[in-house]
């Protein structure tokens, strides 16, 4: 089996496949991993969680076709996801693969997680009193109010953080208060990426991707998302500060607490996914290192391989 470098005469490099949700990144990664002698390193924050399969569109074991996937199913739903911890584990996985002569494929739509691997992303300190005050604001007024406040202070960070992600909103507002600088100012300016990485972005026409999102959400509910949430409730999903706020899961939990209208939960989930796609697109389009491809184009895998050989 060949590697990325087989025609380059050098060691394999990291290939990052990024872009909005629903574009086909995971499927392309498996195709390329088979051809390049590679393994996938997950960069989707919610696919870190065990049991969160249907609602995150995690590839099944069969769909992975024997390609090893790293950093899937590594957290319990009660654990809080941390970009700093992810950075350590993902870089370790990438470096082990490179040392073994394997091609790492960093795959996902969580922009901050991707940047944590590729760039010199540092993490500002914390202030427990400031954080506690913002957590109280979250409890009293809700995540949407904090998101509006963040948009006033740092529109770039607001684009990158979901209005439902209270934990990340609190952290961003905490950093702004204790440093006196926008949260986004702590993000590194993209330069030469670590590991000599090649960055590939997938996107689709807006209407086409919206339709794909709607179909994906319909299938999630048809394929048992509500049952998955009920099972995860038994494992402490409601106590999970990160997992309980994932798109789809939060909406199902709300309906289980209320009228039980899962059609309404599905409609809200689809709407929020479409909104999330636009935020992802805005985040990734700022990174000029990314080579963009229409995910619908024929021969996509071959075109990406050709890019690696240039």
From Swiss-Prot:
Keywords: ATP-binding, Magnesium, Nucleotide-binding, Transferase, tRNA processing. Transmembrane segments: none annotated. ATP binds at residues 19-26. InterPro entries: Dimethylallyltransferase, IPT, P-loop_NTPase. It is an enzyme of class 2 (transferase). Signal peptide: none annotated. Its cofactor is Mg(2+). It holds the Pfam family IPPT. GO terms for molecular function: ATP binding; tRNA dimethylallyltransferase activity. It comes from the Bacteria. GO terms for biological process: tRNA modification. It catalyses: adenosine(37) in tRNA + dimethylallyl diphosphate = N(6)-dimethylallyladenosine(37) in tRNA + diphosphate. Substrate binds at residues 21-26. SUPFAM superfamilies: P-loop containing nucleoside triphosphate hydrolases. Its EC number is 2.5.1.75. Catalyzes the transfer of a dimethylallyl group onto the adenine at position 37 in tRNAs that read codons beginning with uridine, leading to the formation of N6-(dimethylallyl)adenosine (i(6)A). Monomer. Belongs to the IPP transferase family. This is tRNA dimethylallyltransferase.
């Amino acid at each position: 089996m060949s590697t990325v470098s087989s025609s380059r005469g050098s060691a394999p490099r990291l290939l990052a496949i990024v872009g909005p949700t629903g574009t086909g990144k995971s499927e392309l990664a498996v195709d390329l991993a088979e051809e390049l002698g590679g393994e996938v390193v997950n960069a989707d924050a919610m696919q870190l969680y065990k049991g969160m399969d249907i609602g995150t569109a995690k590839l099944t074991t069969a769909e992975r076709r024997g390609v090893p996937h790293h950093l899937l199913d590594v957290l319990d739903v009660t654990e809080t996801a941390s970009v700093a911890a992810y950075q350590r584990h993902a870089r370790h996985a990438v470096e082990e693969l490179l040392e073994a002569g394997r091609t790492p494929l960093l795959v996902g739509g969580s922009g901050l997680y991707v940047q944590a691997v590729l760039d010199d992303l540092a993490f500002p300190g914390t202030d427990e009193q400031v954080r506690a005050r913002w957590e109280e604001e979250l409890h009293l007024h809700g995540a949407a109010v904090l998101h509006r406040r963040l948009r006033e202070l740092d529109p770039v960070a607001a684009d990158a953080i979901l209005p439902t992600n209270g934990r990340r909103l609190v952290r961003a507002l905490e950093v702004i208060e204790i440093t006196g600088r926008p949260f986004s100012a702590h993000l590194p300016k993209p330069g030469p990426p670590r590991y000599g990485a090649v960055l590939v972005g997938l996107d689709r026409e807006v209407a086409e991707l919206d339709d794909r999102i709607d179909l994906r959400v319909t299938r999630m509910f048809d394929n048992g998302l509500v049952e998955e949430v009920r099972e995860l409730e038994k494992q402490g999903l409601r106590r999970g500060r990160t997992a309980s706020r994932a798109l789809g899961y939060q909406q199902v939990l709300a309906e289980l607490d209320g009228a039980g209208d899962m059609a309404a939960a599905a409609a809200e989930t689809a709407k929020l996914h479409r909104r999330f796609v636009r935020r992802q697109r805005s985040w990734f389009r700022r990174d000029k290192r990314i080579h963009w491809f229409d995910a619908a184009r024929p021969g996509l895998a071959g075109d990406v391989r050709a890019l690696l050989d240039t």
